[in-house]
Amino acid sequence: MPRLEVSIRTRDGTCPASIFTPGDGPGGGKASWPGVIFFMDGLGIRPVMWEMGQRLADGGYLVLLPDLYYRTGPYSPMVASEVLADPNRREALMKLVRGLDRDRKVTDAGAFIEFLSSRPEVKGKRFGATGYCMGGNASLTAAGAFPDRFAAAASFHGGHLATEEPDSPHLFLGKLRGRVYVAGAVEDASFPDVQKDRLERVLSEAGVDHLIETYPGARHGFAVRDLPVYD
């Protein structure tokens, strides 16, 4: 079916979201699919996020793409080259990113889980989580906060995954029952080797099935097609 626009009630308001299901891909032709929460990157909802959501869905999933900036109201799709070249717009963007603290990420994730659990076309009670940039952080945060509800969690060039802050995502992953995949960039100051090693150690000690990779020559944002650093 085409992209379906829905509204999700959260503690702080109403979050608009898109649902994607398989089209003509290998996952099509079924009545229900495993659910995946797709956490957007810092530039927010825009056509490339919809494209990525549909591509993931075509692998055989129902994909939920929520607008994590719903608390600030509607906004026009952001163009990376324009936003990053304008100091004022860049700072406004970073304010949005910083506004998503752990408490908000966790309460939102709980609402998204409840929403997926209510959908008849979603199969099973354990879901997947994936995200890019700040969405990678949100993906691991959600999985750590609800360890029994996620079968897998992925982060692509997610930042600040294993910092020394008390709300760092790695501190809450010890009870996770699912698998974790982290793809980082060697040239990414938000996920340096010290964080990679710290995350590796925590997941290994907890016995969590995981794989962490960092790609030489890649930069933060390498996996999103409309970013200048896409590779």
What are these regions (language model features)?
Residues 1-231:
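N-terminal cap/leader regions of alpha/beta-hydrolase-fold enzymes
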